[in-house]
């Protein structure tokens, strides 16, 4: 959408005031494959799943706070956990939520979640009685509690999912019977998902909204105009930097970024290390040395930060690592590796894929394409998939050379970083898509996740960052400046640690 058209919309149709029916309309750029975060990651699944399902905990300003579990105890070794569930909590069909459901849910996520490495150490999950659950791990897991939020490990109804149907294709992933603040009222596939307030929700007086409608705009250019005209109230994970400048000039609209500070979104190039070209760490090093990350960050709109290693800047676990920008040495490396330039100056051509709805990725790819061909004579042919599913099939099957991706570091490396490089998450979407495998790196990740001393843990993650950077496992590029664009009268979304990936039971409209 052009700036001129948006400017016209700004003055012709200001955003609406709070609605009479106490509802919220959230814009989506595509329809999610399902609503169950135990079997699929991604912002679309998680923002709806976090409303339909509860977790044992939710994230507060200082870490995990009670949610479905009203309290818990953890032993001094961080290996034994006991959870006490709230009395009277029910699923949306009225069935009581018990410790058996929680045990079932943890096991389901352990087997099926794309980030299953975060639960690898869980050894025993034992219901003591209907409202008490014991969990044991094989090694200390000081960060384990952070995993049990609804966007990662939702509490599922065992009486529905335990019917023998494979959970990753279960019809309840769309026709959800949840445990959270909102119940599924209706859906029109490809168009809308309507959630209604669940009157039996276990937190008194919550949720405060009566309805949330998720409306799909297949043309992302329609979303800014919908926000301006009041046809949508909120759009999360926006990277529409040009439009944001116009949004900020409208007093009825607010643009915020702080809610993504714990998600640590970033962009990287993932090499298929089974490809003969990218099997060589030296070739990967040459590509890294041919890109000036600072210049890239300045060229990409939106205020991104350059990134040189596996953990994004801004994370408390980030440790500075860098690869020097040295195109001359990059060319010498490629010469030694047996990739001379041909008569047209090209060393080799590879295809680079990207998730087709990720417009931010495409803007970076075009920059990288010009830099690679100019500095080292490597041609990256951009391949656009017909739809996100086609891209996902291609990268998980290994039928790709390089793919561009946008990932979240999440609030702990054991959740958001380990899964990208762990052997046990290879060929899983938004996890280890590169098929990288290194037993020493796996062991370092296990040691880091088990370290109870924060400084000792930070030192182990520093060693991991140095090791992965030395191998140039991926080409880390920059942070992503996601923003939430919303009607200014929508309250208690931006103050949630993960924004719309948190339960919106507190969200409400400002009233006169």
Describe the residue ranges of each PLM region.
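Structural transition elements
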Residues: 272, 279, 305-337, 354-364
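A structural "hinge/loop" feature
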Residues: 30-46, 68-70, 95, 139, ...
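Surface-exposed binding/hinge segments that line
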Residues: 73, 117-162
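Aromatic- and charge-enriched surface segment that lines or borders ligand/interaction sites
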Residues: 71-115, 128, 134-136, 226, ...
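Gly/Pro-rich hinge or "lid" segments in bacterial periplasmic/extracellular proteins
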Residues: 62, 150-207, 211, 221, ...
């Amino acid at each position: 959408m052009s700036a001129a058209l948006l400017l016209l919309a700004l003055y012709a149709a200001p955003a609406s005031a709070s609605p009479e029916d106490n509802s919220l309309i959230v814009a989506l750029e595509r329809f999610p494959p399902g609503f169950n975060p135990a079997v699929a990651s991604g912002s679309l699944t998680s923002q709806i799943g976090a409303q339909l399902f509860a977790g044992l905990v939710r994230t507060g300003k200082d870490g995990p706070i009670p949610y479905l579990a009203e309290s818990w105890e953890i032993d001094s070794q961080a290996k034994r956990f006991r959870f006490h569930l709230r009395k009277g909590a029910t699923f949306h069909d009225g069935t009581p939520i018990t410790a058996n459901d929680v045990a079932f849910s943890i096991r389901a996520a352990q087997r099926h979640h794309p980030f299953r490495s975060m639960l690898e150490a869980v050894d025993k999950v034992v219901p003591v009685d209907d409202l008490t659950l014991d969990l044991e791990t094989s090694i200390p897991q000081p960060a384990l509690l952070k995993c049990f939020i609804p966007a990662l490990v939702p509490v599922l109804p065992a009486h529905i999912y335990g019917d023998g149907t494979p959970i990753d294709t279960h019809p309840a992933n769309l026709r959800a019977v949840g445990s959270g603040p909102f119940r599924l009222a209706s859906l029109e596939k490809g168009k809308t998902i309507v959630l209604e307030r669940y009157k039996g929700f276990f937190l008194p007086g919550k949720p405060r909204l009566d309805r949330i409608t998720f409306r799909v705009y297949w043309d992302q250019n329609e979303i800014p105009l919908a926000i301006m005209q009041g046809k949508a109230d909120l759009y999360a994970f926006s990277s529409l930097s040009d439009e944001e400048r116009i949004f900020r000039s409208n007093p009825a609209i607010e643009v915020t970024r702080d809610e993504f500070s714990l998600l640590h979104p970033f962009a990287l190039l993932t090499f298929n290390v089974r490809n003969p070209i990218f099997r060589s760490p030296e070739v990967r090093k040459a590509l890294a040395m041919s890109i000036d990350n600072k210049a890239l960050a300045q060229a990409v709109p939106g205020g991104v930060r350059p990134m040189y290693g596996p953990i994004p800047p801004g994370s408390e676990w980030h440790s500075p690592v860098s690869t020097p920008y040295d195109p001359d040495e990059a060319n010498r490396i490629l010469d030694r590796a047996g990739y001379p330039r041909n008569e047209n100056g090209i060393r080799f051509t590879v295809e680079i894929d990207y998730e087709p709805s990720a417009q931010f990725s495409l803007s970076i790819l075009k920059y990288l394409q010009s830099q690679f061909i100019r500095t080292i004579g490597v041609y990256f042919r951009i391949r656009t998939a017909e739809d996100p599913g086609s891209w996902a099939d291609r990268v998980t099957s290994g039928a790709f050379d390089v793919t561009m991706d946008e990932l979240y570091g999440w609030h702990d490396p054991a959740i958001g970083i380990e899964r990208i490089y762990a052997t046990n998450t290879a060929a899983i979407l938004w996890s280890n898509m590169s098929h990288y495998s290194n037993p020493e790196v796996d062991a370092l990740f296990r040691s880091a996740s088990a370290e109870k001393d924060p400084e000792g843990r930070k030192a182990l993650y520093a060693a991991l960052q140095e090791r992965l950077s030395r191998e140039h496992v991926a080409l880390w590029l920059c942070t992503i400046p996601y923003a939430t664009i919303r009607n200014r009268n929508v309250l208690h979304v931006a103050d949630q640690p993960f924004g719309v990936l948190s339960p919106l039971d507190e969200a409400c409209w400002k009233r006169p």
